[in-house]
């Protein structure tokens, strides 16, 4: 009798993806984040579904419906904070996952990488729209500021903004459509994750050495299933601690004030995971220039395969490039800090310098260093 795991049309796909998948024998804990992101997505969809059962997408009742979830629904506070902090965990893992890809040259899998960048955009859009739903002060003003950026598009800009708003300002129509999109996008993301994995399994995983690992591959199960479960336990521990001890640590106190179109908060800022891009946006005095810099700061990831000049794939044996990548990481931390600061001296100047160095490191210094390292190794 044939093995069902290997013969059943559906189970066979799962088998080739998670059980008998040939995996390099030397991949480190940096390869855990893919599975952790999958778990995060599942947590977000489940908690989001339960929140949607009690939430009302109407300007008059949205804020009080969230309060009702926290006060009156059984474990509603837990579901709400798991969803909010789950999003933060999602982005932490996303940034680690991308950082791993940059360090080990995983971006040379062009299809997988490009689908990943599109996934990043989709997750960012979903998170932004989700932040609008509680209809607090920061929800309302964040939505107003970010949607207004589209008015910088020549000729069609102002019309496009009013079309997205469904009126002449952020109002009931905006909230309703944001809820609809926020609900449907995670399912589109799930489908894209499957495409992401499909492309990855065409080539197989990269590994820390950046060398071909076809001669030394082991089955995914049980080796990496166990390793992933360890990562999962760490994730669940940290997420649980965050939810139960300081659930509002990463949130904004302004969002506990109901949205008021007549009262602008002194400092409008997005959630922490968008602050680096927000800092780049604010560092350019011109509106259109700022919007272009904002989009390009993420879109630049797609250029990495083209900018790769080194004859080695990974940075494991390239100390100068390693140093540059860590400088880039520090630069992003500085940008994140600046994004949360008021627009005044010296923060404006620091933000502008950090924005310039962000693009310079990626577009000029990294390719030059790769080329130079080839010369140093007489390649």
From Swiss-Prot:
UniProt binding sites for a ubiquinone: 201
Membrane topology listed for this record: Multi-pass membrane protein
Alphabetized UniProt keyword annotations: Electron transport, Heme, Iron, Membrane, Metal-binding, Mitochondrion, Mitochondrion inner membrane, Respiratory chain, Transmembrane, Transmembrane helix, Transport, Ubiquinone
Highest taxon above the source species: Eukaryota
GO cellular component: mitochondrial inner membrane; respiratory chain complex III
GO MF entries: metal ion binding; ubiquinol-cytochrome-c reductase activity
Cofactor: heme b
Residues annotated as transmembrane: 33-53, 77-98, 113-133, 178-198, 226-246, 288-308, 320-340, 347-367
Localization annotation: Mitochondrion inner membrane
UniProt-annotated binding residues for heme b b566: 97, 196
Family matches, as InterPro entries: Cyt_b/b6_C, Cyt_b/b6_C_sf, Cyt_b/b6_N, Cytb/b6-like_sf, Cytochrome_b, Cytochrome_b_C_euk/bac, Cytochrome_b_N_euk/bac, Di-haem_cyt_TM
BP GO annotations: mitochondrial electron transport, ubiquinol to cytochrome c
Binding site for heme b b562: 83, 182
Note on how the cofactor is bound: Binds 2 heme b groups non-covalently.
Note: Heme 1 (or BL or b562) is low-potential and absorbs at about 562 nm, and heme 2 (or BH or b566) is high-potential and absorbs at about 566 nm.
Family: Belongs to the cytochrome b family.
Function, as annotated: Component of the ubiquinol-cytochrome c reductase complex (complex III or cytochrome b-c1 complex) that is part of the mitochondrial respiratory chain. The b-c1 complex mediates electron transfer from ubiquinol to cytochrome c. Contributes to the generation of a proton gradient across the mitochondrial membrane that is then used for ATP synthesis.
PANTHER family membership: CYTOCHROME B
Quaternary structure (record): The cytochrome bc1 complex contains 11 subunits: 3 respiratory subunits (MT-CYB, CYC1 and UQCRFS1), 2 core proteins (UQCRC1 and UQCRC2) and 6 low-molecular weight proteins (UQCRH/QCR6, UQCRB/QCR7, UQCRQ/QCR8, UQCR10/QCR9, UQCR11/QCR10 and a cleavage product of UQCRFS1). This cytochrome bc1 complex then forms a dimer.
Descriptive protein name: Cytochrome b
Biological source species: Proechimys simonsi
């Amino acid at each position: 009798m044939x093995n069902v795991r290997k013969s059943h049309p559906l189970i066979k796909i799962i088998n080739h993806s998670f059980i008998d998948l040939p995996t390099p024998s030397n991949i480190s804990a940096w390869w855990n984040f893919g599975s952790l992101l999958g778990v995060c997505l599942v947590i977000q969809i489940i908690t989001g579904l339960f929140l949607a059962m009690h939430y009302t997408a109407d300007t008059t009742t949205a804020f009080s419906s969230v309060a009702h979830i926290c006060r009156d629904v059984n474990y509603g506070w837990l579901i709400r904070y798991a969803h909010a902090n789950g999003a933060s965990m999602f982005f932490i893992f996303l940034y680690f996952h991308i950082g791993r890809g940059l360090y080990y040259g995983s971006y040379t899998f062009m299809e997988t990488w490009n689908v990943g960048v599109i996934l990043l955009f989709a997750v960012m859009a979903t998170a932004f729209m989700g932040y609008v739903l509680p209809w607090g002060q920061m929800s309302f003003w964040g939505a107003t500021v970010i949607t207004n950026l589209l008015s910088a598009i020549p000729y069609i800009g102002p019309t496009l903004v009013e079309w997205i708003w469904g009126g002449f300002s952020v109002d009931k129509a905006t909230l309703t459509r944001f809820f609809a999109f926020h609900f449907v996008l995670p399912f589109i993301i799930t489908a894209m994750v499957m495409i992401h994995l499909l492309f990855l399994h065409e080539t197989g995983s990269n590994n820390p050495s950046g060398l071909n690992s076809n001669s030394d591959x082991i089955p995914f199960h049980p080796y990496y299933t166990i390793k992933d479960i360890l990562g999962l336990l760490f994730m669940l521990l940290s997420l649980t601690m965050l939810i139960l001890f300081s659930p509002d640590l990463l949130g904004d106190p302004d969002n506990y004030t109901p949205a008021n179109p007549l009262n602008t908060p002194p400092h409008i800022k997005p959630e922490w995971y968008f602050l680096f891009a927000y800092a780049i946006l604010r560092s350019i005095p011109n509106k259109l220039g700022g919007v272009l810099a904002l989009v390009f700061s993420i879109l630049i990831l797609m250029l990495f395969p083209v900018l790769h000049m080194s004859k080695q794939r990974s940075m494991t044996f390239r100390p100068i490039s390693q140093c540059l990548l860590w400088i880039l990481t520090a630069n992003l931390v500085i940008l994140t800090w600046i994004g949360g600061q008021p627009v005044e001296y010296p923060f404006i100047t620091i933000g502008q310098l950090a924005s310039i160095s962000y693009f310079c490191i990626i577009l000029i210094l990294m390719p030059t260093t790769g080329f130079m390292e080839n010369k140093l190794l007489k390649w």
